[in-house]
């Protein structure tokens, strides 16, 4: 399956909703609550980030970047036009395919460390101003 389908439906319009001139979007993954943890547990263990980002890279390489641009982008146009009942503009996806990589920078805490609740474990930011929209577009997958 095309990796760009692995998002929440409403995020397919985010690229049009950011304020004009947006160039950078910085996002984080933070454990927000310990309400289901045993009483007195106020930390979580950081783990899995290396696997997730390696998987993300490999998945997009195999299911988007290594496939013909017309094939993957026309599939996106067809499905998203039906889903949104409009003639969906895929220019931003075509430009991403031309780039041939996900333009993001990821930072994470070391795996295995205990992290207090409400402390970010992972941050993600776009590395190309043109692709400010990709940061939160990928959030669902992460």
What are these regions (language model features)?
Residues 1-142:
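Ordered alpha/beta subdomains of enzyme catalytic regions
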């Amino acid at each position: 399956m095309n990796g760009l389908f692995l998002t929440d439906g409403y995020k397919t319009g985010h690229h049009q909703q950011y304020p004009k001139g947006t160039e950078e979007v910085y996002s984080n993954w933070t454990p927000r609550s310990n309400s289901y943890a045993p009483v007195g547990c106020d930390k979580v263990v950081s783990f899995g980030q290396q696997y997730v980002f390696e998987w993300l890279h490999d998945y997009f390489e195999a299911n988007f970047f290594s496939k013909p641009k017309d094939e993957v982008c026309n599939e996106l146009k067809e499905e998203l036009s039906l889903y949104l009942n409009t003639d969906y503009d895929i220019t931003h996806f075509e430009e991403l395919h031309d780039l041939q990589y996900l333009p993001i920078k990821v930072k994470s805490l070391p795996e295995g460390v205990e992290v207090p609740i409400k402390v970010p474990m992972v941050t993600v930011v776009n590395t190309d101003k043109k692709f400010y929209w990709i940061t939160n577009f990928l959030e669902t997958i992460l």
